[in-house]
């Protein structure tokens, strides 16, 4: 909700940000800029203005910090005289003003660079004329002028003995500062290049000692400490033991970076974000209290440096937790030669150095909130998530790294100018691609570099424990990669009906050929690989495989390779360029030859899984008897005749060893199915006069009601019927009340399918012509008597099954007014199913008419043909 701002309220920029407005204007802000707050448009965006009369614009609220409003200075209390007993000190009153950066003696600005801009400068050569109250153009540096006299201190110990700290309640009343974080925020450390004679001013709230009496001169002209960005600067403290727990701040929040998944910590009061946990000591520091002087400088510096190991680059670097400065170990040796360069060293790294990337603001965790931003004067091109790579690699020795316009990392060899592009597969694993020759590798080629100087080390380096070198990983190189057309024709010995040619990114690595899924952005003739690989679709192991040029009967395309794997699968690989497919043929053939040379030779006559297309064996074969081919037959055209004779011998031996069908049934490997089984065998196996499936279907249909419209005439879902058939064939326990078979037309369709799948219909082939001759009789009585006698001559399973079915259909006909199934309709449905000739005849239309008449007559004469017991 928008909120107006009363009075002059200013904000201080803490993080860089830029975006393009709807009018094309580029809005960019830098840290330590100060803008006037006009309106709090939303929770996430504020309306600000730089200069009076300037054009206003929007800024993200999390990237700026609201500065406290100015108040009238409080008169300083009179200094008190020391008493014999301790007394409670009077609280200090502060007024807040903005001062410009002091100008050095040479006329240049004394404002530090990089992260040092958050540190305050020394309080020297400062006059009242240098201060500007809310100057529009001056940098935002918070100036606190204590009303009580402050004695210059030469050391922290001296300050601790006689210093007076402002009460925590006074500091917390400023609105933006909290008493819980004062100890880690109110500090004014000296720059590294300044002399030790400079005054250090600190506010230490832990001390409650009475103030000392000051001279009149000190009261009239007190030194004025300057505090800049006080809430972001940690306090300079003496080195503590590793076991001492750090001081905790209860205002830290834990968030997760949506881009990398790494947790980071955010302070809502100060707006500070950090990768390192504020609740524990940094991990990986082997010597947290190692002095910066041990890196190569003999001076005693105020800050503490920790030595760390970068796992990805294998280099040692030093990190200062107080200033955030990070320096590589080899860079410190170069600084030893130039002391001035060392003093002016800025705490910044390459844009891709670990720890340099500022963590995102909490809005990155909740992208759905971005829709609530104002639509007035900005176009969120530079959104919070567009902060660049969060975990880039450091360039190895001998390589330089830069970001291309496509936001890809380009590594250039400093000696040969060879260039490699760093990409990532779908799992996030990085690899490198050479645009010149389209080669791909997991690692950059190693560049021989001179050994580092060992004589420049400081004597204090021996105190630091030796860093354990990372474990050596086996470098895997890609033999070949590119875009090819491929199709799979045989899947583990089973030939596929259709060939689907697709273009996919293909990678040959370590004896394994991987076909990734369709690449929408690549063509067969393209040289550029997809920026992000998809899921692997086929993986072919070249060990024991064979490769040959595909004959014309396999494919009409040109330049087609046929690859047969050891598990019996076959693939066709094609490319329009003959030169490219020839290089692939050479690379795959060399991989097969190299891997097959290590395979043990098989004895003559031993079967091979590659020969038969499957590793499944029957009979008395042992697992260790099956070994892949020692060499690919197709790679040696001269021995094709001998190979064919050897294959015939193996097939003959295999067929002789093949177990009989009866033995497989006895062992339970093969079970007779219900659908397609002879009716007599099924009844004998189930020990029932009528198949159980027929009984179940009839009971279920009658239980659900015979008044359903179109019963036995309307077809059910064919896919569901096939599922029911599979269930009946493979599972003895069938429950037709399951929700999957709730449609009654599925059950009636399965029952009709059962009778159609019988090897011999319910009216046997031997009785077909007799029934047709009987139905042609002109005398109705004689016709009925002849049909009844023929039905009684049917085999017992056929007779009993026909009795149950006809009686059920008669009950269906009784509900003909509701289900609209008359005798003629039922006869048309079941006539061709129950009665059909063994061989199709020329007069099929007339035969179908007689078939329907036979079933219709049996339905009319059901009580006479099948009398009740």
UniProtKB/Swiss-Prot annotation:
<keyword id="KW-0677">Repeat</keyword>
<dbReference type="InterPro" id="IPR008936">
    <property type="entry name" value="Rho_GTPase_activation_prot"/>
</dbReference>
<dbReference type="InterPro" id="IPR036028">
    <property type="entry name" value="SH3-like_dom_sf"/>
</dbReference>
<dbReference type="Pfam" id="PF00169">
    <property type="entry name" value="PH"/>
</dbReference>
<comment type="function">
    <text>Rho GTPase-activating protein which may be involved in clathrin-mediated endocytosis. GTPase activators for the Rho-type GTPases act by converting them to an inactive GDP-bound state. Has activity toward CDC42 and RAC1.</text>
</comment>
<dbReference type="GO" id="GO:0005096">
    <property type="term" value="F:GTPase activator activity"/>
</dbReference>
<feature type="modified residue" description="Phosphoserine">
    <location>
        <position position="469"/>
    </location>
</feature>
<dbReference type="InterPro" id="IPR011993">
    <property type="entry name" value="PH-like_dom_sf"/>
</dbReference>
<dbReference type="InterPro" id="IPR001202">
    <property type="entry name" value="WW_dom"/>
</dbReference>
<keyword id="KW-0472">Membrane</keyword>
<feature type="compositionally biased region" description="Acidic residues">
    <location>
        <begin position="331"/>
        <end position="343"/>
    </location>
</feature>
<dbReference type="GO" id="GO:0017124">
    <property type="term" value="F:SH3 domain binding"/>
</dbReference>
<feature type="domain" description="WW 3">
    <location>
        <begin position="414"/>
        <end position="447"/>
    </location>
</feature>
<comment type="subunit">
    <text>Interacts with SH3KBP1/CIN85.</text>
</comment>
<protein>
    <recommendedName>
        <fullName>Rho GTPase-activating protein 27</fullName>
    </recommendedName>
</protein>
<dbReference type="Pfam" id="PF00397">
    <property type="entry name" value="WW"/>
</dbReference>
<feature type="compositionally biased region" description="Polar residues">
    <location>
        <begin position="345"/>
        <end position="356"/>
    </location>
</feature>
<keyword id="KW-0254">Endocytosis</keyword>
<feature type="region of interest" description="Disordered">
    <location>
        <begin position="447"/>
        <end position="474"/>
    </location>
</feature>
<dbReference type="GO" id="GO:0005886">
    <property type="term" value="C:plasma membrane"/>
</dbReference>
<feature type="domain" description="PH">
    <location>
        <begin position="477"/>
        <end position="593"/>
    </location>
</feature>
<dbReference type="GO" id="GO:0005737">
    <property type="term" value="C:cytoplasm"/>
</dbReference>
<feature type="modified residue" description="Phosphoserine">
    <location>
        <position position="249"/>
    </location>
</feature>
<feature type="modified residue" description="Phosphoserine">
    <location>
        <position position="155"/>
    </location>
</feature>
<feature type="site" description="Arginine finger; crucial for GTP hydrolysis by stabilizing the transition state">
    <location>
        <position position="713"/>
    </location>
</feature>
<dbReference type="InterPro" id="IPR000198">
    <property type="entry name" value="RhoGAP_dom"/>
</dbReference>
<dbReference type="InterPro" id="IPR036020">
    <property type="entry name" value="WW_dom_sf"/>
</dbReference>
<keyword id="KW-0343">GTPase activation</keyword>
<dbReference type="GO" id="GO:0005768">
    <property type="term" value="C:endosome"/>
</dbReference>
<feature type="domain" description="SH3">
    <location>
        <begin position="6"/>
        <end position="69"/>
    </location>
</feature>
<dbReference type="InterPro" id="IPR001849">
    <property type="entry name" value="PH_domain"/>
</dbReference>
<keyword id="KW-0963">Cytoplasm</keyword>
<keyword id="KW-0597">Phosphoprotein</keyword>
<feature type="modified residue" description="Phosphoserine">
    <location>
        <position position="215"/>
    </location>
</feature>
<feature type="region of interest" description="Disordered">
    <location>
        <begin position="104"/>
        <end position="137"/>
    </location>
</feature>
<feature type="domain" description="Rho-GAP">
    <location>
        <begin position="677"/>
        <end position="866"/>
    </location>
</feature>
<dbReference type="GO" id="GO:0007266">
    <property type="term" value="P:Rho protein signal transduction"/>
</dbReference>
<feature type="region of interest" description="Disordered">
    <location>
        <begin position="331"/>
        <end position="389"/>
    </location>
</feature>
<feature type="domain" description="WW 1">
    <location>
        <begin position="246"/>
        <end position="280"/>
    </location>
</feature>
<dbReference type="GO" id="GO:0006898">
    <property type="term" value="P:receptor-mediated endocytosis"/>
</dbReference>
<feature type="modified residue" description="Phosphoserine">
    <location>
        <position position="459"/>
    </location>
</feature>
<feature type="modified residue" description="Phosphoserine">
    <location>
        <position position="350"/>
    </location>
</feature>
């Amino acid at each position: 909700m928008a909120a107006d701002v009363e009075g002059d309220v200013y904000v201080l920029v803490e993080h860089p940000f830029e975006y393009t407005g709807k009018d094309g204007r580029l809005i960019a802000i830098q840290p330590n800029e100060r803008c006037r707050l006009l309106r709090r448009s939303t929770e996430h965006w504020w309306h600000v203005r730089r200069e009076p009369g300037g054009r206003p614009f929007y800024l993200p609220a999390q990237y700026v910090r609201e500065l406290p409003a100015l108040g009238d200075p409080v008169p300083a209390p009179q200094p008190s005289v020391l008493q014999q007993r301790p007394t409670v000190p009077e609280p200090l009153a502060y007024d807040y003003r903005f001062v410009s950066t002091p100008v050095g003696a040479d006329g240049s600005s004394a404002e530090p660079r990089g992260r040092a801009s958050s540190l305050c400068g020394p309080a020297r050569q400062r006059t009242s004329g240098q201060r500007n109250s809310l100057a529009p153009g001056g940098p935002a540096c918070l100036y606190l002028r204590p009303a009580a006299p402050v004695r210059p201190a030469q050391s922290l110990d001296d300050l601790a003995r006689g210093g007076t700290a402002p009460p925590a309640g006074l500091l917390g009343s400023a609105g933006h500062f909290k008493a819980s974080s004062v100890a880690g925020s109110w500090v004014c450390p000296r720059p590294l290049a300044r002399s030790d004679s400079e005054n250090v001013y600190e506010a230490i709230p832990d001390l409650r000692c009475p103030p000392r009496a000051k001279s009149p001169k000190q009261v009239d002209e007190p030194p004025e400490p300057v505090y800049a960005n006080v809430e972001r600067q940690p306090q300079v403290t003496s080195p503590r033991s590793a076991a001492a727990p750090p001081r905790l701040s209860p205002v830290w929040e834990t968030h997760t970076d949506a881009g990398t998944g790494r947790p980071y910590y955010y302070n809502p009061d100060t707006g500070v974000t950090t990768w390192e946990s504020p609740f524990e000591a940094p991990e990986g520091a082997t010597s947290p209290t190692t002095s910066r002087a041990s890196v190569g400088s003999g001076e005693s510096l105020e800050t503490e440096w920790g030595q760390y190991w970068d796992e990805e680059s294998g280099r040692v670097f030093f990190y200062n937790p107080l200033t955030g400065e990070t320096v590589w170990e080899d860079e410190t040796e170069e600084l030893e030669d130039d002391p001035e360069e060392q003093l002016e060293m800025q705490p910044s790294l390459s844009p891709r150095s670990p720890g340099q990337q500022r963590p995102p603001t909490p809005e990155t965790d909740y992208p759905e909130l971005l829709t609530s931003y104002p639509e007035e004067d900005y176009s969120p091109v530079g959104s919070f998530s567009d902060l660049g790579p969060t975990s880039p690699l450091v360039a190895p020795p001998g390589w330089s790294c830069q970001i291309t316009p496509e936001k890809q990392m380009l590594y250039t060899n400093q000696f040969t100018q060879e260039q490699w592009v760093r990409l990532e597969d779908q799992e996030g694993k990085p690899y490198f691609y050479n645009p010149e020759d389209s080669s791909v590798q997991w690692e950059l080629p190693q560049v021989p570099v001179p050994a580092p100087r060992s004589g420049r080390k400081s004597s204090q380096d021996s105190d630091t424990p030796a860093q354990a070198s990372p474990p050596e990983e086996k470098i895997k190189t890609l033999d070949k990669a590119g875009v090819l057309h491929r199709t799979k024709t045989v899947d583990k010995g089973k030939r596929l009906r259709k060939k689907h040619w697709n273009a996919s990114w293909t990678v040959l690595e370590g004896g394994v050929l991987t076909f990734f899924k369709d690449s929408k952005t690549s063509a067969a003739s393209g040289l550029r690989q997809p920026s992000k690989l998809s899921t692997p679709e086929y993986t072919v192991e070249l060990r024991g495989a064979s490769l040959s040029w595909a004959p014309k009967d396999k494919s009409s395309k040109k330049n087609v390779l046929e690859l047969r794997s050891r598990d019996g699968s076959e693939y066709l690989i094609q490319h329009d360029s003959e030169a490219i497919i020839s290089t692939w043929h050479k690379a795959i053939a060399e991989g097969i030859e190299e891997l097959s040379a290590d395979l043990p030779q098989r004895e003559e006559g031993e079967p091979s899984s590659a020969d038969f297309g499957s590793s499944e064996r029957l009979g008395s074969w042992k697992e260790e008897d099956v070994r892949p081919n020692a060499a690919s037959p197709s790679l040696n055209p001269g021995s094709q005749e001998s190979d064919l004779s050897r294959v015939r011998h193996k097939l003959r031996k295999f067929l002789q060893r093949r177990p009989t069908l009866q033995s497989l049934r006895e062992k339970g490997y093969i079970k007779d199915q219900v659908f397609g089984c002879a009716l007599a065998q099924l009844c004998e196996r189930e020990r029932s006069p009528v198949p159980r499936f027929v009984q179940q279907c009839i009971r279920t249909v009658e239980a659900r009601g015979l008044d359903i419209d179109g019963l036995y005439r309307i077809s059910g879902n064919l896919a569901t019927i096939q599922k029911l058939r599979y269930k009946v064939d493979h599972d003895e326990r069938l429950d037709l009340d399951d929700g999957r078979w709730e449609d009654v037309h599925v059950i009636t369709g399965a029952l009709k399918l059962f009778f159609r799948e019988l090897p011999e219909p319910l009216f046997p082939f031997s009785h077909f012509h007799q029934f047709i001759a009987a139905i042609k009789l002109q005398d109705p009585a004689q016709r009925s008597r002849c049909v009844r006698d023929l039905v009684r001559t049917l085999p017992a399973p056929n007779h009993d099954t026909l009795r149950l079915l006809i009686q059920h259909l008669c009950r269906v006909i009784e509900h003909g007014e509701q289900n609209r199934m008359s005798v003629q309709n039922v006869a048309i449905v079941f006539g061709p199913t129950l009665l059909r000739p063994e061989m199709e005849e020329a007069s099929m239309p007339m035969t179908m008419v007689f078939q329907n008449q036979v079933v219709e007559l049996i339905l009319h004469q059901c009580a006479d043909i099948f009398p009740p017991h």
